[in-house]
């Protein structure tokens, strides 16, 4: 795990060869939907594992079949709320749940409009109550302009103030990170890698394309 010196509370996993290998497969335009979804699940699981290294632990006593000994309990792992941004984050959440099996789950359906306005449409929100000792993890593979996540974080803040507010993604653009940190300076951001920039259409470069379309197929246009 590597802290990005450009911002406070922003971390990447560029020093993990395994995570970088999965990311490389996701970037490949020839990776099919099945492999793409599996890759997102694996990233959710392994980045979730890395997140536990930042959580509070407690030393406890445990009794083996032979004698008593000391061990640890990752306390925060049992107080997690995962917010999934449909639809691209579904596989990412599946991986996170394998690490945070006690997590309560919230679902937000949000979509970003086209350039230049990038207006955000939200039509479904189900978020559990957030408690003061909770760690909220908002899962969204692509942190591009940051508009979607800022809107989601505003909704999450209505349900309570957590101990920690974490955004977990696969790729991020510097522009999106800066906007999020300006709006929510307390938010911690963990991504596999911070990419170079956004293009004029709001896509991350070099990126991996539209994560939702690549995981689940491009949606049909509404018939007229």
Swiss-Prot record:
UniProt record similarity statement: Belongs to the UPRTase family.
Official protein name in the record: Uracil phosphoribosyltransferase
Single GO biological process annotation from the record: uracil salvage
Keyword Secreted: no
Function statement: Catalyzes the conversion of uracil and 5-phospho-alpha-D-ribose 1-diphosphate (PRPP) to UMP and diphosphate.
NCBIfam families: PRK00129.1, upp
Pfam families, sorted: UPRTase
Gene name of the encoded protein: upp
InterPro entries in UniProt: PRibTrfase_dom (IPR000836), PRTase-like (IPR029057), Upp_A (IPR034331), Ura_phspho_trans (IPR005765)
Regulation (activators, inhibitors): Allosterically activated by GTP.
Positions of GTP binding: 38-42
Gene3D superfamilies xref list: 3.40.50.2020
Known cofactor(s): Mg(2+)
Keyword terms: Allosteric enzyme, Glycosyltransferase, GTP-binding, Magnesium, Nucleotide-binding, Transferase
GO molecular function terms noted in the UniProt entry: GTP binding; magnesium ion binding; uracil phosphoribosyltransferase activity
Free-text cofactor note: Binds 1 Mg(2+) ion per subunit. The magnesium is bound as Mg-PRPP.
Binding, uracil: 204, 209-211
Involved pathway(s): Pyrimidine metabolism; UMP biosynthesis via salvage pathway; UMP from uracil: step 1/1
EC number(s) given by UniProt: 2.4.2.9
Chain positions recorded as 5-phospho-alpha-D-ribose 1-diphosphate binding sites: 87, 112, 140-148, 210
